Amino acid sequence: MGHMVDDLKMVDYYVGKGANGLELDVTFNSNGVAEYTFHGVPCDCFRSCTRYENINTYLDYVRQLTTPGDPKFQEKLIFLIMDLKLKNSPSSYAQFNAGINIADKLSQYYWKDDGKARAYFLISVPYVSQTAFIRGFQHRFEEKGLEKYYEKIGWDFSANEDLNSIRAAYQKLNITGHIWQSDGITNCLTRGDTRLKEAISKRDTPGWHINKVYTWSLDKVNSIKYALNLGVDGVMSNYAETLVTILSEDPFKQKFRLATYEDNPWETFKP
């Protein structure tokens, strides 16, 4: 998965490098209205932090790339991670509105052809204290009759919080599936593997409802290989081609491959 893919030029770049998933950073105003795909300073080392695009334009563009039959269709692109930047929407009211707004934007700009665009979306909320966003999203889906698109939506809490706290948050939301768990840190720093190993263990433990575990943002060959050997389901990187190359080599090509549209992102992989 390509990391911090926040303008159309970078979308084309990462798709061209073989990424089957892209992460986009979504910024909101104080009222919870999504405005741009934008990360800002600080960001990963050796990257530009200030690339951006209007969120409506971005969603319409990736709609074209993920719609079979469209002249711009890219078959390998199947997964989009929306990394929500909710710091400008600190109140529960604004976060609830942000959930409503993202549901609206997906229906207006991505699914506007009655769902012909086929990518899956992982909605990545930073903190368990921000579950008002999820409630707003769910409210709008049900209010507008968008429930059929739930099969395209998954959830993640991305701030490396305690896994038991995350589990409790999902229980309060009555979410028991379509759950990915992330673990990671900027490529400028190193991070231990204790929580990542714990997440993988919980994924394989009945009752935890974690379907996939991914790590970010890994750029070095040895770091990516180590994560794969631990058993992660996904790797987010600034260098998508590095992972593509690793997966073409022994011994990894015997165990792993890039996911395709035929793979269900909400099912736990059983080797």
From Swiss-Prot:
The active site is at residues 3, 39. InterPro entries: PLC-like_Pdiesterase_TIM-brl. It is an enzyme of class 4 (lyase). Coiled coil: none annotated. Binds 1 Mg(2+) ion per subunit. One of its GO terms (molecular function) is lyase activity. Keywords: Cytolysis, Dermonecrotic toxin, Disulfide bond, Hemolysis, Lipid degradation, Lipid metabolism, Lyase, Magnesium, Metal-binding, Secreted, Toxin. Mg(2+) binds at residues 23, 25, 83. The keyword Secreted applies. It comes from the Eukaryota. Disulfide bonds join 43-49, 45-188. Its cofactor is Mg(2+). GO terms for biological process: killing of cells of another organism; lipid catabolic process. It catalyses: an N-(acyl)-sphingosylphosphocholine = an N-(acyl)-sphingosyl-1,3-cyclic phosphate + choline; an N-(acyl)-sphingosylphosphoethanolamine = an N-(acyl)-sphingosyl-1,3-cyclic phosphate + ethanolamine; a 1-acyl-sn-glycero-3-phosphocholine = a 1-acyl-sn-glycero-2,3-cyclic phosphate + choline; a 1-acyl-sn-glycero-3-phosphoethanolamine = a 1-acyl-sn-glycero-2,3-cyclic phosphate + ethanolamine. One of its GO terms (cellular component) is extracellular region. Expressed by the venom gland. Dermonecrotic toxins cleave the phosphodiester linkage between the phosphate and headgroup of certain phospholipids (sphingolipid and lysolipid substrates), forming an alcohol (often choline) and a cyclic phosphate. This toxin acts on sphingomyelin (SM). It may also act on ceramide phosphoethanolamine (CPE), lysophosphatidylcholine (LPC) and lysophosphatidylethanolamine (LPE), but not on lysophosphatidylserine (LPS), and lysophosphatidylglycerol (LPG). It acts by transphosphatidylation, releasing exclusively cyclic phosphate products as second products. Belongs to the arthropod phospholipase D family. Class II subfamily. This is Dermonecrotic toxin SpeSicTox-betaIF1. It comes from Sicarius peruensis (Six-eyed sand spider).
